[in-house]
Amino acid sequence: MEKNREIISKNNINVEVFLIRSLIGKLNKKVKVLKALGLNKIGDKKVHFLNQSIKGMLNETINMILLSEVSNV
């Protein structure tokens, strides 16, 4: 299984974002980024097309998420 940083370095792929850490006690900026990604509570999953704006959002919250590459969506 690839690590988060290896997946973020790729371009134009679909990634599944999985929230693995709680939002409680986190900086308000990080909470807003995660909610913009569609992740509200632990265990939420969303599929996003990996472009520059999504990469920035994922880099901001890299320690709270788990990424996996999705082939067909």
Swiss-Prot record:
Keywords: Ribonucleoprotein, Ribosomal protein. One of its GO terms (molecular function) is structural constituent of ribosome. InterPro entries: Ribo_uL30_ferredoxin-like_sf, Ribosomal_uL30_bac-type, Ribosomal_uL30_ferredoxin-like. The lineage of its organism: Bacteria, Pseudomonadati, Spirochaetota, Spirochaetia, Spirochaetales. Part of the 50S ribosomal subunit. It comes from Borreliella afzelii (strain PKo). One of its GO terms (cellular component) is large ribosomal subunit. GO terms for biological process: translation. Belongs to the universal ribosomal protein uL30 family. HAMAP family: Ribosomal_uL30_B. It comes from the Bacteria. This is Large ribosomal subunit protein uL30.
